[in-house]
């Protein structure tokens, strides 16, 4: 199940490293990073290892520097059923901290402020029958141009090539969007944003359901689309509730760990 999503996320992961021919495990696909050429952000941090696991078959994508492959495989074996809990992630940080320093790097371990690692949850569906159609509201509208309605309060990143938004007095107050052309893609990643004064009113759920229903409808514009995914942070409980209320299923989780150079 979700084979197209697995290909989509693996392809995205390959943009951050070099696919390896090494067979770690029949269920683990490896992407290697070069520790001397990590991409550091403006704060001086870079992702040193990340892993993603699909729930239907337990398969994983791992991208890391070669020096960490064996320790991470041992970790996967030890915590196979609990890879995403605070307990297991803290254990991993503590046990790899010294190894990281040998390579001129230091792990970001600010656990008190929850900045030591970043979690992501992927929801999705392949079938429009999974969707809670009863959650749709009459004020959800489909539109393409962000200039068609008043979108005051939304950053440009929340204006997609295709949008389903809640329209109140000619103003969009909640918007579900995708930024990839549905004419050319089998997997569409959608997002949702709602203005603060309009949250907890069911608008987000209505827009997500309407967007996913259309993308999976088989209409000419979206006839290539096979799967819809919805990505959110592991700490964003309200966003996860929106996904579940829409009828989307939790299909995968990812966790990313950061490092910086020792100066």
Named regions from a protein language model:
Residues 2-148:
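Acyl-donor-binding surface of acyltransferase catalytic domains
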Residues 61, 186, 215-233:
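Conserved GNAT acetyl-CoA-binding A-motif
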Residues 115-124, 247-263:
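Conserved catalytic-core motifs of GNAT/GCN5-like acyltransferases
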Residues 144-161:
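Short, basic/aromatic recognition patches
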Residues 156-162, 167-187, 191-195:
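A conserved beta-strand-loop-helix scaffold within acyl/acetyltransferase catalytic domains
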Residues 170, 202, 236:
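Conserved G/P- and acidic residue-centered "switch" motifs that form tight phosphate/ATP-binding loops
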Residues 190, 194, 200-217, 241-245:
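Conserved acetyl-CoA-binding loop-helix of GNAT-fold acetyltransferases
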Residues 205, 233-252:
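Conserved active-site alpha-helix within GNAT-family acetyltransferase domains
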């Amino acid at each position: 199940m979700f084979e197209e999503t697995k290909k989509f996320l693996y392809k995205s992961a390959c943009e951050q490293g070099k696919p390896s021919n090494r067979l770690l495990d029949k269920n683990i696909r490896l992407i290697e990073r070069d520790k001397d050429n990590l991409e550091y952000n403006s704060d001086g941090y870079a992702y040193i290892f990340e892993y993603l696991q699909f729930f239907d078959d337990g398969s994983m994508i791992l991208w890391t520097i070669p020096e960490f492959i064996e320790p991470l495989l041992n970790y996967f074996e030890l915590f196979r059923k609990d890879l995403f809990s605070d307990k297991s992630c803290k254990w991993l940080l503590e046990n790899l901290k010294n190894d990281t320093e040998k390579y001129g790097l230091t792990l970001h371990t600010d656990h008190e402020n929850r900045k030591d690692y970043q979690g992501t949850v992927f929801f999705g569906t392949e079938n429009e029958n999974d969707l809670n159609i009863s959650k749709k509201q009459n004020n959800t509208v489909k539109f393409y141009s962000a200039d068609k309605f008043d979108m005051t309060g939304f950053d440009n990143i929340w204006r997609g090539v295709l949008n389903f938004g809640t329209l109140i007095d000619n103003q969009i107050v909640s918007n579900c969007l995708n930024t990839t052309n549905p004419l050319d893609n089998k997997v569409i990643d959608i997002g949702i944003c709602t203005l603060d004064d309009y949250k907890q009113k069911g608008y987000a759920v209505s827009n997500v359901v309407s967007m996913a229903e259309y993308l999976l409808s088989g209409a000419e514009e979206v006839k290539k689309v096979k799967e819809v995914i919805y990505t959110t942070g592991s700490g964003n409980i309200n966003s996860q509730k929106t996904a579940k209320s829409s009828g989307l299923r939790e299909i995968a989780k990812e966790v990313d760990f950061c490092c910086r150079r020792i100066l």
